């Protein structure tokens, strides 16, 4: 699971003269404090008039955020939680928002590192040190030769030893990490979702992904259950993975062309038709129905 740690900041709301707190700002009012701020996990296109509440919103700015940060309002306090390690952009946006909230409420900003900041001091917060601290934890995966998934605003990113080396070989590891995360977040491609099924006797579990014709798609190169799926599976294993190929999507006459053993399809996918975007996932270029049939023929031979 791609969470290490985080830092949490809180800003007390204004008190009312007769006791209690002023009304919490609405999503719309919050988003007006920082240019371009919106909520990645909101159902609405635009920030709504709903007051901020206990529900955690993932806040950020399109193309500037890589992981976003958590924002909610509880017990008269605005709470901002920034993941470790976050991107440079995530930190800049979070600190700007905290500064604005502090200025507006007249309250200091309290951090769970036991320090207190005013609206000016917070802008000088040494976030690079926090990113570096988080990146140090990445070195563990290098020693254990593992792949670690770090959550992003649009999709998770898989890091392995090679990528960790690249981060630390860079003049600014924090900026390099930010760049690696960002490249994957804003790719113009569909992220395929995993589906798990059991056979009718309930003995075997198999996993499936779908690839549609003419659609650039991000797929795992060698699938394994996501941590969410693994939690649901417990000790049970996925016995096989298949790729379902769908055609006729463009003329709303979508139908399954065929399904194929996942590994066999990937092994026969021409090299110029995909590239790795991180340690585990590939971007598959748009394939026509004919190209799909050709790959299927080889994969099933």
Model-flagged regions — what are they?
Residues 90-115:
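Acidic, low-complexity cytosolic segments
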Residues 124-246:
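Aromatic/basic-lined ligand-recognition segments
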Residues 4-6, 102-106, 190-191:
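A short, compositionally biased
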Residues 37, 41, 105, 145, ...:
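Short, flexible helical or helix-coil boundary motifs
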Residues 111-131:
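Short, highly charged C-terminal tails/helix-capping segments
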Residues 233-301:
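Extended, charged low-complexity segments
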Residues 28-89, 218, 243, 252:
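Short, intrinsically disordered low-complexity segments
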Residues 2-53, 142-169, 294-301:
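Short, extreme N-terminal segment that most often corresponds to the first beta-strand
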